[in-house]
């Protein structure tokens, strides 16, 4: 920008950097679509000229005649198949039909045939249901057998999948088994006899200086020994070991082993109690004579 002492107009002219319309830009013809319009008009004119001369009508007649012939051939083939089906099936023939309710194939017998409508009435074997079917939709009797085999295979596969899922769930939840063992152990603890009374309790007044030197009672058995089933007992602790189950045939090896271990435990319990009682009596006599 010139900083001179002249008039203001020369300063404004010197400060202008760009003026529209004064120069020729390289991209001035970007929006010029004159050539495109001319090409479109030329194509439309040539199409109209060909249409007037009849060149396009001949080409258009050829594809029109082709689809008319194909449906005619298809209809003939369909009629041949339907006629063959009508000749094949007779009243009383065994067949297989698709029941409209569930879409499955069932064995059936043809009760009547309508040759005009090309339909028939079938009676499903073993069910007695009647249904109208197209003759062309009837299947051979072996189709029902094959369908039943596939259904049975699918049902067996579903059952095996369910049993596999149940076994996996039982393996993943061991807490339920431990809870069952604990509940059985708790119920059996109420049936165990009480610990033997100390010397002097129920046997007359206790004498000074006497001590019970007999073997202590055995500890309670582990919970897994108490998991076997035994019949219920009346209220109160039993004096003798409980009898074995009434129906031993219904028990497995684990239950039989549990019953045997319980019997051993109870036998040792009462044996220790008896030995302690005898030793207490013997020591009491010795101290009495001394």
UniProtKB/Swiss-Prot annotation:
The Tudor domain mediates association with dimethylarginines, which are common in snRNP proteins. Residues 276-290 are annotated as: Required for interaction with SYNCRIP. There is a cross-link at residues 48, 207 (Glycyl lysine isopeptide (Lys-Gly) (interchain with G-Cter in SUMO2)). Residues 94-207 are annotated as: Required for interaction with RPP20/POP7. Residues 65-79 have a biased composition (Basic residues). Belongs to the SMN family. Residues 170-190 have a biased composition (Polar residues). Its main location: nucleus. Keywords: Cell projection, Cytoplasm, Isopeptide bond, mRNA processing, mRNA splicing, Neurogenesis, Nucleus, Phosphoprotein, RNA-binding, Ubl conjugation. The keyword Phosphoprotein applies. GO terms for molecular function: RNA binding. Residues 237-264 are annotated as: P2 (binding site for SM B). Residues 151-161 have a biased composition (Low complexity). The SMN complex catalyzes the assembly of small nuclear ribonucleoproteins (snRNPs), the building blocks of the spliceosome, and thereby plays an important role in the splicing of cellular pre-mRNAs. Most spliceosomal snRNPs contain a common set of Sm proteins SNRPB, SNRPD1, SNRPD2, SNRPD3, SNRPE, SNRPF and SNRPG that assemble in a heptameric protein ring on the Sm site of the small nuclear RNA to form the core snRNP (Sm core). One of its GO terms (cellular component) is Z disc. The modification Phosphoserine is found at residues 25, 28. Residues 88-148 form the Tudor domain. GO terms for biological process: axonogenesis; DNA-templated transcription termination; microtubule depolymerization; positive regulation of RNA splicing; regulation of neuron projection development; spliceosomal snRNP assembly. The keyword Cytoplasm applies. Coiled coil: none annotated. This is Survival of motor neuron protein. Residues 10-41 are annotated as: P1 (binding site for GEMIN2). SUPFAM superfamilies: Tudor/PWWP/MBT. Residues 1-29, 54-85, 151-219 are annotated as: Disordered.
